Amino acid sequence: VSEQLRIVHAHGDRITVTEPVTGVELLSYVYRAEADWEAPKPYIHPLRTLAGDVVTDYRPNDHRWHKGLSLTASHLSGANLWGGNSYVHGEGYLAIPERVGSMRHVAFDEVSADDSGRVVIAERLTWHPYDGELWAEETRRVEIHDVDLDSRSWALTWTSAITNRRTEPLLFGSPTTAGRDMAGYTGLFWRGPRAFRDGRIIGPDGEGPELMGTQGEWLALSGEHDGADGFATVVFAHAPENAGGHPAHWFVRNEPFAAIAPSWAFFEELALPPGETLTRRYRVVVADGAWGRADIAKYLEGRPW
């Protein structure tokens, strides 16, 4: 039986969730706005295993706008809600500050913990281009659950519903839809710690960096820590209803850094008509140890949606 997880809300800044038996702070959900150039948006960092090992990176020197686990939109109707340089076909990555937008925190509708060991963070956000116009409204639900000291794992379910508030379609794209080969990053994005470079990438039917741009129900990366002994595994899984929408493809790297994104617009733009809502739900499993394909499949099968 799970104990109630502990929540601390530093208003205007962040929400932290702590596992009471180990005393490990599992995550910090930061919603305080940061630098404009980095496309301010909420993010989760640090994200920790039950052993207390951090499995996210924050503002690495190669991409200052990579912040833990966050929802992004690298190409959105000509705007950049990713941060930093913007990809322009034929010219590469350019510093175009007037393209960089933001996802702004509006309010929390729920921040709660129950006796089953589940935490719910329900938030409303607004999406804006550089000039501050309202382009979209988002309802977001981050749930922490299945905290299991025996299997040394826990799970996070992230649901985002984005409603177009423009009078024209919102076009979700990526550097690949803009012309850069096999760089289709957008949507929910995880930047792993530096130690996870060269980590093992595992999918249901294959492994390694060649899983870039492929489709599948789940994808994982395991790496060996610096500092602490041992390994950790981070698993991303699609909710069943995601399959009915615009096709998703995995963005994944273990060189020059570790990253995963279940991209919603890898090869082709996704057009969201005015007033309509794009909903996606994902699960992120954070586990101590180097899980293999069979371990991951067994875990996911044992915890249906």
Language-model features: locations:
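Beta-strand-rich N-terminal accessory domains
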Residues: V1-S70, L149, G173, A297
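Extended, loop-rich substrate-binding clefts of extracytoplasmic carbohydrate-active enzymes
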Residues: Q4, S70-R152
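Acidic (Asp/Glu-rich), glycine- and aromatic
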Residues: Y29-R48, L149-R200
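Extracellular/lumen-exposed scaffold segments
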Residues: W37-G90, I202-Q215, L219-L221
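Hydrophobic residues positioned within well-ordered beta-strands of beta-sheet architectures
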Residues: I121-E123, E138-R140, L156-W158, L188, ...
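Active-site/ligand-binding surface loops and adjacent short beta/alpha elements
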Residues: P169-A243
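Beta-strand-rich recognition/accessory modules
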Residues: V234-W305
